[in-house]
Curated annotation (Swiss-Prot):
Organism taxonomic ancestry: Eukaryota, Metazoa, Chordata, Craniata, Vertebrata
Keyword Hydrolase set for record: yes
Native species: Pongo abelii
Enzyme class: hydrolase
Self-association state and partner proteins as the record states: Homohexamer. Interacts with GABARAP and GABARAPL2. Interacts with GRIA2. Interacts with PLK2, leading to disrupt the interaction with GRIA2. Interacts with MUSK; may regulate MUSK endocytosis and activity. Interacts with CDK16.
UniProt-recorded name of the protein: Vesicle-fusing ATPase
Amino acid sequence: MAGRSMQAARCPTDELSLTNCAVVNEKDFQSGQHVIVRTSPNHRYTFTLKTHPSVVPGSIAFSLPQRKWAGLSIGQEIEVSLYTFDKAKQCIGTMTIEIDFLQKKSIDSNPYDTDKMAAEFIQQFNNQAFSVGQQLVFSFNEKLFGLLVKDIEAMDPSILKGEPATGKRQKIEVGLVVGNSQVAFEKAENSSLNLIGKAKTKENRQSIINPDWNFEKMGIGGLDKEFSDIFRRAFASRVFPPEIVEQMGCKHVKGILLYGPPGCGKTLLARQIGKMLNAREPKVVNGPEILNKYVGESEANIRKLFADAEEEQRRLGANSGLHIIIFDEIDAICKQRGSMAGSTGVHDTVVNQLLSKIDGVEQLNNILVIGMTNRPDLIDEALLRPGRLEVKMEIGLPDEKGRLQILHIHTARMRGHQLLSADVDIKELAMETKNFSGAELEGLVRAAQSTAMNRHIKASTKVEVDMEKAESLQVTRGDFLASLENDIKPAFGTNQEDYASYIMNGIIKWGDPVTRVLDDGELLVQQTKNSDRTPLVSVLLEGPPHSGKTALAAKIAEESNFPFIKICSPDKMIGFSETAKCQAMKKIFDDAYKSQLSCVVVDDIERLLDYVPIGPRFSNLVLQALLVLLKKAPPQGRKLLIIGTTSRKDVLQEMEMLNAFSTTIHVPNIATGEQLLEALELLGNFKDKERTTIAQQVKGKKVWIGIKKLLMLIEMSLQMDPEYRVRKFLALLREEGASPLDFD
């Protein structure tokens, strides 16, 4: 039928505004009819009608959202004509609606169930016309929401005929809501509305993981396993849409503790996690920065760190973005409560504040706290429970594969600019740098670069660079090896100077007893390397004083080629209190546990224990500490060889320490004249004629002297004139009680 001219008016009541209907006088149209409103030849809008007596005949009243959508003004002349829906093609199957609070003042973070919303929507607007782009007001749970129709799909015609669905869906611009229509709600952009339930669209979520990162670009090497474990525990749940996480009843991990030796990449890893994630920049805080001299300020600093996350969670609920807070040196502020001296309790209240913020009464589900320390033993245990810093990840010394990755990263730029010589084999360097941390490998590359640069500096009165040669600057294999030899030593490696002084005269194999000790030592080394059943192997070298026990222990350790070798010797603990000794020993063993293969030589055990026979007196505190350390197995995947030395086996027997060692090897003195002559020949200090004279005196006779004492007597004799050397040597042997008294 032809359209009729009518005048646009304002909707008479608020209740009628919520019906989404255009309101007319019953003399013009009937309730439930549908009309097309033409505002211009090219603009037409479909409405469902409702009658009300207060509307003047010839007028049609619209709510504010309807007038905005159609671009109508009060009193505007419009053309209105009846419209009939083709129910075979225009019944709405699914409709996507964007929703937000109508008034921003009335926002809250309460969850709104979209399933109940959809049922209420169908009930309120059944048999009404809807168009794509239409705006309307929707009342639900005494709250007003602004709706915008985003998309409409027609119902499958087969369903209308009572046949099985064919799956055919057609997009339409205008449709009629029926009882079987499906409504999906979609939260408006930047809205704080918290939608739950199944009747909501899957949001186009930005992936939490940055798509263009890789380990090499991030400058992280040797941490592949650690990173994958962190991802599995801390980020996997955050990759999934909130609705799936909600259905599983899953809570995100809120905290990670990274611990390990200095220089192994804890801070680097935490710093790069922020770059890996499509999240806001992480807040990086050094532990001591939190502390403040004013009362209550330290706790306020903690609260400030979490303020943004709390505000956003209140506003956006489950759709809040991720807030990352990184604590470097977290042990500075999270020490065990009650462990600090003094009565102020400042540290304790800071710990309490942090505990309550991470997982307290008002739980935050949009934070990730990353703590870093090389002293995890100092941290309050309440911070380490699940719900707080529950993912504990050791960032240890890199293995050979990890060292290769790290060296590749630090030499990549040189390689790209052809400044790395062709003779540099990164694999060789990775093999040679056992127990180097990431920072030490970076230092090695830096030292090699400095060595190469130094070659091109002119040695004159002024410091000048030879620019001609500088053009051909190359960092060579020799530069790396020189830096490895002279400049960079690993903190958790083998310092040759530690044990070189113990074997500066070499090992004098004066007889089968010495060979047997070395062979047994080699067997124990192989057992430590190869056996999975005995990760801890300990041996006690016992024998009389000056028999060379320490030298043999140092030799066995050196020949093992273990990446970590340390000597725990009383000469490094002179003047230490008992507690300080225990701490020093514990540190050596703790460092050993960080290496894949380690050897610790515990030298002169009775001296470590402060043993003296008068009394007798010894330190029970050190004894108990040593017993525990000798029996404590290293962490899984680590192996430890302990070599102890003592001159008082009987004393250790009484102290029940012998049982702490896996085995005991006896190191004897030189006991026969033949062994003495063998030692003299190997040392080569006396001439053949002199040795013949000595042989006449000692051959076939019993002697008793330690190799260390023998060396001292020989050196003393050599200070005499040549004709008196032999006589002096024999006299010294007699005075030491090392030989029979019938020497001439």
